[in-house]
Amino acid sequence: MARKSLIQRDKKRKKLELKYHWIRGSLKKEIHKVPLLSDKWEIYVKLQSLPRNSAPTRLHRRCFLTGRPRANYRDFGLSGHRLREMVQACLLPGATRSSW
């Protein structure tokens, strides 16, 4: 189980990312449209003035049961440990163990 403070920090980052998503996107589009370098620098300054935690690269995908930050499967939203346990207990319909 991940520490609760880390899980809360990621939730806060997700909220900030959603809040500033459109602002960040519009500023990035403006950078590509503006031909003058001096105008681009002004836009870069605006972009850098946004909160650091609002950048989407600072988000981390976590297991929604345990909060584990590594070995996550996107399709299920689970870490590999919990996914294996749930498949063996037949709690995930349609998931089968591979054998060849």
UniProtKB/Swiss-Prot annotation:
UniProtKB keywords: Plastid, Ribonucleoprotein, Ribosomal protein, RNA-binding, rRNA-binding
PROSITE patterns attached to this UniProt entry: RIBOSOMAL_S14
InterPro entries: Ribosomal_uS14, Ribosomal_uS14_bac/plastid, Ribosomal_uS14_CS
Cellular component GO terms held in the UniProt record: plastid; small ribosomal subunit
GO MF annotation terms: rRNA binding; structural constituent of ribosome
GO biological process: translation
Pfam families from the UniProt entry: Ribosomal_S14
Disulfide-bond pairs as recorded: none
Localisation: Plastid
Broad class of where this protein is predominantly found: plastid
Role summary: Binds 16S rRNA, required for the assembly of 30S particles.
Family, per entry: Belongs to the universal ribosomal protein uS14 family.
Assembly information from the UniProt record: Part of the 30S ribosomal subunit.
Protein name: Small ribosomal subunit protein uS14c
UniProt source species: Cuscuta reflexa
